[in-house]
A protein has these predicted regions:
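Class I SAM-dependent methyltransferase "Motif I" SAM/SAH-binding loop
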Residues: 93-95
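Glycine-rich SAM-binding Motif I of class I
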Residues: 97, 101
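Class I SAM-dependent methyltransferase SAM/SAH-binding core
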Residues: 102-148
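A short acidic, Gly/Pro-enriched loop at the edge of an enzyme's catalytic core
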Residues: 150-159
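SAM-dependent methyltransferase
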Residues: 194-275
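C-terminal lobe and adjacent flexible extensions of AdoMet/dcAdoMet transferase-like proteins
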Residues: 263-315
């Protein structure tokens, strides 16, 4: 799913980068060195990298759909949740419509929000290919996670969802709070907000950013060229933002390597629960995968179902 975000962040936490490491005291100099992290980078450069990382991965919708074509477990989860909670459903970061169209086929009315032009075009094409009854259940709204509005629909959604790490494009506490405030405004009394983000993998976060990882071979769905895919990243441990680079390199060596940026905010479990509570929600269910299993150290995802806290004064 594509993940829209506010262009101007109210808190510049993402720009806090560590300084270049200094030699430690004698008793620490023999310890193994950590892989170099982000820095020293200017505030402006980090902001530019984060902004680019919110857009570039979603500029080629055909490639995006090809890369995630086997991702189905989350769709099954959100379909089951929608069956239990009912519609209409508000979907944040709907992207090209993986989840949207499945929910509409199940008979739910869905308001799908996104801001990435290529993904919105792909979503519209998918909707046009649906049976008429399913297509008519989908309303597409171009909007940002922090400022979206569905006129005439405040307080009307029993369920809001943000699938496939959408909230990892909220880079500051202010952005998280703004997004959750918009969700709260649109939820019906007793309504739920369900979303998933990754459980931070500490070994992955400290990988050497100079190396290439996850090298695989694939055929580009548009050009039909055989490509190598690989990735690496820098990690800002203060802003908790991974600045990821995706490399697309022609196997035959003819032509340049394309580098696509992707930025993701990492949320640790206790922190995430506190952020949700600060925005007037409470976590009513929490899972470690899309098979409804408990969250533990082996999990790759954090799947949360939240409701408005009973004592919240916010609307």
């Amino acid at each position: 799913m594509t993940r829209a975000r506010a262009r101007t962040r109210s808190h510049k936490q993402s720009g806090h980068v560590p300084r270049a490491p200094r030699p430690g005291p004698p008793e620490t100099r023999d310890r193994p060195e950590r892989a170099p992290r982000v820095g020293p980078l200017s505030q402006e450069l980090v902001d530019d990298l984060v902004d680019a990382g919110s857009r570039e991965h979603y500029a080629d919708a055909a490639l995006y759909d090809h890369e995630y074509r086997r991702r189905r477990a989350d769709v099954t989860f959100y379909r089951e949740l929608a069956r239990k909670r009912g519609g209409p459903i508000l979907e944040l970061g709907a992207g090209s419509g993986r989840v949207t169209t499945a929910l509409a086929r199940d008979g739910h009315r869905v308001v799908a929000i996104d801001r990435a032009p290529a993904m919105l075009d792909r979503l519209r094409a998918r909707v046009a290919a649906l049976p008429r009854a399913a297509a008519e259940r989908i309303e597409i709204v171009e909007g940002d996670l922090c400022t979206f509005d569905v006129p005439g629909a405040h307080g009307s959604f029993p369920l809001a969802i943000a699938a496939f790490n959408v909230l990892e494009h909220l880079y500051t506490r202010g952005e998280v709070h703004a997004c959750l405030a918009r969700v709260a405004e649109h939820l019906a009394p007793g309504g739920a907000f369900a979303f998933d983000v990754q459980l931070p993998d500490l070994a992955w976060l400290v990988r050497d950013p100079a190396k290439r990882w996850a090298r695989t071979r694939f055929t580009d769905p548009t050009t039909k060229r055989v490509m190598f895919y690989s990735t690496n990243h820098d990690y800002d441990p203060v802003g908790q933002i991974a600045l990821i680079r995706l490399y697309y390199e022609p196997v035959d060596g003819k032509g340049p390597t394309r580098v696509v940026k992707l930025s993701q905010r990492k949320f640790f479990p206790a922190e995430l629960e506190a952020l949700v509570a600060h925005a007037g929600f409470r976590v009513v269910e929490r899972y470690g995968d899309f098979a409804w299993r408990p969250l533990d150290a082996s999990a790759e995802s954090q799947v949360l179902i939240c409701e408005r806290a009973a004592n919240s004064r916010r609307r």
